[in-house]
Amino acid sequence: MSLLTPLRGLLLACITLGGQAMAGEPLKLEAYNPGHAAIFPVSSVIVSGAHDAILVDAQFGKGQAEQVVERLRASGKQLTTIYVSHGDPDYYFGLDTLTQAFPKARVVASAATVEHIRKTMDAKLAYWGPQMGADKPARLVVPQVLEGNRLELEGQALEVVGLDGPQPDRSFVWIPSIKAVVGGVVVSEHIHVWMADTQTAKSHADWLSTLTKIEQLAPRTVIPGHYLGDSSRSLDAVRFTAGYIRDFDTEAAKAADSAALIAAMKQRYPNLADESSLELGAKVAKGEMKW
């Protein structure tokens, strides 16, 4: 046997150990969702490494954003980045509070999300501000455009999936090193799914395609963007969302008006919370309301 053989083995072992060291320890997830205590039960997810952290989504009200600040400070990790996954205000109104607490953290979002925010933020604040009272933001923070489709935390990737697809404003975050999905706007659980923003058959087909893509990744963990109660943190949330979309389309095609559609969906899902989302979505679907 050549003397080079054991040397090659030693070299390969060193390369392997070096790669593991560069990758760092497994990332950890902490989800904060205010549930019934807030207008929107939206998820903010802290992704932590050994020393640093990335926050996905910034909450809606000041009080809820302060809860995220407390959790970040308690973690002892340095917040390097806040990533905003969608352009609706429950994903970014809390940036005012978070950027005051962590002024060195960069705030980024996809180009589609930044465009959405810029076009709608003044109208959204005018509508929601009076309802939020002391929880409304003192100022609106617009993220910078994320370059590319990934973030990095201590050598491990957070991939934004869907930016090159038909719905770049409805993407999700995939963390391959721990096989986890932060679902954002595309995944809900234990709640009537928000349908008002997707008003065409194609938009629903594209949404279902995104959910299929999540299933194909076979994640071990899925954190829904909106949920009430305890989340399964699994593909059950993805399957629930897909089933709801299909059922909504089936009943919308048969219903004479929004009242009939609402009744049919309540019969299919008698125990779901947030009926106001169903009522608004049904009115939009049946042409009784513009959104």
What are these regions (language model features)?
Residues 25-74, 172-185:
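Conserved beta-strand hairpin/beta-sheet module of binuclear metal-dependent hydrolase folds
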Residues 74-150:
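Active-site HxH/HxHxD metal-binding segment of metal-dependent hydrolases
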